[in-house]
């Protein structure tokens, strides 16, 4: 497993899977990669990958709608790096199919309230539960209520369906299973593109009915199978809006400036810190999906001149990032590591856990 962060975080399913490529695949630690995948798939319950384990008795905790869906992307990346289809077929494929089956029929384990609606979109959570990564809660007060049809969850759902269909074809599974997966994926993509585009803000809704500008929409472009076609103007508009409103040298802000409850500085007592956690504070790990979305737009561009222009802008983004984090790694609060989050105004002070796995990985 992977520890989410020091000094206080333990091993979390969501954090482990987001950190998976950067910590084990990039370093060619494929034996560790297999062990991590086996760890977080051995306790799947009703289609849910554990989001963690109790620090008291080590029982699995299932307070997450995204951990199971993140698994598919990491399995795909594991294959991309290793071509190890045998391991996936023998140890993971049946479990992946069962996750799809459970999400389709509905899951109410630990009040996750996950179900596939008639419009082929996944709905999850309630006013009382927090099961996405924006999970701050103060007592009974949910700071960022995101119950309903979340943008990143449905992007991950489409991606999961397409990856499973790809594996089903590779493993010569039943033709009916392959066709069902592809049909469901096509219907999900159609519905997503019809409902999630926010024409007014030139981006995607964070949750259907919620027009706050947040970075979660990047997952619609960053995954192996983007639910938004990277060639389209919608994709470019969305990416430009995120770049303009949320990107800075240290990561992406969790909420655009000007939105209600926007907060730039992470400070004060535990209540004030929790209130601001996902309300404008900068998170470095979001640079990962931002970069992947950027690359997918570049790969999809047909115009040679425009592609060259995009490549030039991407190189400038990478160089600026290298400069920022070379200094941070050598002169920051934690030499050799990257913090959990940063303030969103100068001097962009590092805050939260002083060594965060997904910050380093992404």
Segments predicted by a language model, with ranges:
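Extended glycan-interaction surfaces of carbohydrate-active proteins
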Residues: 1-11, 35-56, 108-149, 187-285, ...
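Aromatic-rich carbohydrate-recognition surfaces in CAZymes
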Residues: 10-16, 20-131, 150-154, 158, ...
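Alpha-helical structural elements of signaling/regulatory helical domains
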Residues: 28-29, 84, 88, 173, ...
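Short alpha-helical functional segments enriched in proximate histidine and acidic residues
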Residues: 102-103, 160, 164-167, 188-195, ...
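Surface-exposed helix-capping loop/turn segments at secondary-structure junctions
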Residues: 109, 166-176, 196-201, 300-302
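Active-site neighborhood of glycoside hydrolase catalytic domains
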Residues: 154-190
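Extended, well-ordered alpha-helical segments in internal regulatory regions
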Residues: 161-169, 220, 224-229, 289-302
């Amino acid at each position: 497993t992977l520890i989410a962060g020091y000094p206080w975080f333990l091993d979390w399913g969501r954090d482990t899977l987001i950190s998976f490529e950067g910590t084990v695949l990039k370093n060619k630690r494929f034996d560790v990669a297999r062990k991590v995948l086996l760890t977080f798939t051995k306790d799947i319950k009703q289609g849910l990958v554990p989001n963690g384990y109790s620090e008291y008795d080590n029982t699995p905790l299932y307070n997450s709608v995204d951990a199971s869906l993140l698994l598919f992307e990491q399995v795909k990346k594991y294959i991309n790096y290793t071509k190890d289809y045998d391991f996936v077929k023998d140890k993971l494929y049946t479990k992946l199919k069962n996750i799809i089956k459970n999400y389709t029929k509905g899951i109410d384990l630990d009040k996750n309230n996950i179900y596939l609606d008639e419009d082929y979109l996944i709905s999850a959570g309630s006013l009382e539960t927090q099961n996405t990564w924006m999970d701050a809660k103060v007592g009974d007060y949910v700071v960022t209520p995101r119950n309903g049809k979340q943008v990143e969850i449905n992007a991950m759902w489409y991606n999961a369906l397409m990856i499973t269909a790809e594996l089903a074809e590779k493993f010569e599974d039943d033709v009916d299973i392959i066709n069902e997966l592809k049909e469901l994926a096509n219907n999900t993509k159609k519905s997503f593109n019809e409902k999630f585009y926010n024409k007014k803000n030139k981006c995607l809704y964070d949750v259907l009915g919620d027009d706050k500008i947040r970075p979660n929409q990047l997952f619609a472009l960053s995954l192996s199978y983007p639910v938004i076609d990277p060639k389209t103007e919608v994709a470019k508009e969305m990416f430009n809006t995120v770049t303009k409103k949320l990107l800075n040298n240290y990561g992406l802000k969790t909420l655009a400036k000007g939105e209600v409850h926007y907060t730039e500085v992470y400070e004060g007592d535990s209540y004030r810190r929790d209130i601001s956690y996902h309300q404008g504070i900068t998170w470095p790990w979001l640079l990962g999906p931002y970069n992947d979305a950027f690359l997918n737009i570049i790969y999809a561009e047909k115009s040679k001149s425009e592609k060259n222009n995009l490549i030039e802008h991407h190189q400038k983004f990478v160089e600026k990032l290298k400069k920022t984090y070379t200094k941070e790694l050598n002169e920051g609060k934690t030499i050799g590591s990257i913090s959990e989050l940063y303030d969103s105004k100068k001097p962009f002070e590092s805050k939260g856990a002083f060594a965060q796995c997904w910050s380093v990985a992404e």
